[in-house]
Amino acid sequence: MKILSKSDIVKLLPHREPMLLIDNLYDIEDLKSATAVVNVKKDSFFVKGHFPDNPVMPGVLIVESFGQAAAALTAHGLDKSTYENKLVFLMGVEKARFRNPVIPDCELILKIEAIRSHGRVW
């Protein structure tokens, strides 16, 4: 099983700390699916202010994590000359539900799957 570490992901995405949220990507099926891990730590940048007495990862950062995982999957599956000096954007989110809070000292597991593509839009 191929695993992309954070140092591999940095080569695929323009994001840097503290906004590089995904820690690794595995179960990679090029341009189709993968699993990403976000290690939510006590010292994560959002913990101090969201919310001081009951910290949770903001939903928008969970969605951002999905976008980063999808972008890394896409860049990993393409020939480098295809994506070099280009950005991959999340084009939409349908029916997002946050059923449980994501709290510090937990591992957020994201399963991503490409469900359709149209030209350069996935």
Model-assigned labels for residue ranges:
Residues M1-I3, A70-K111, I115:
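Hydrophobic beta-strand-centered segment that forms part of the acyl-chain substrate-binding groove
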Residues I3, H15, V37-N39, E113:
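Small/polar/charged residue-enriched interaction surfaces, especially the RNA/DNA-contacting tracks
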Residues L4-R16, Y83-E84:
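Short aromatic-glycine motifs in intrinsically disordered, low-complexity regions
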Residues V10, D53, F98-N100:
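Beta-strand-rich interaction surfaces with strong enrichment in secreted/lumenal proteins
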Residues E17-M57, I62:
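Catalytic strand-loop segment that frames the active site of acyl-thioester-processing enzymes
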Residues M19-L21, L108-I109, W122:
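Hydrophobic core residues within well-ordered beta-strands of beta-rich domains
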Residues L25, M57-T82:
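Active-site helix/loop of acyl-thioester processing domains in fatty-acid/polyketide metabolism
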Residues E29-K32, R116-V121:
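Short, conserved beta-turn/loop elements at beta-strand boundaries and strand-helix junctions
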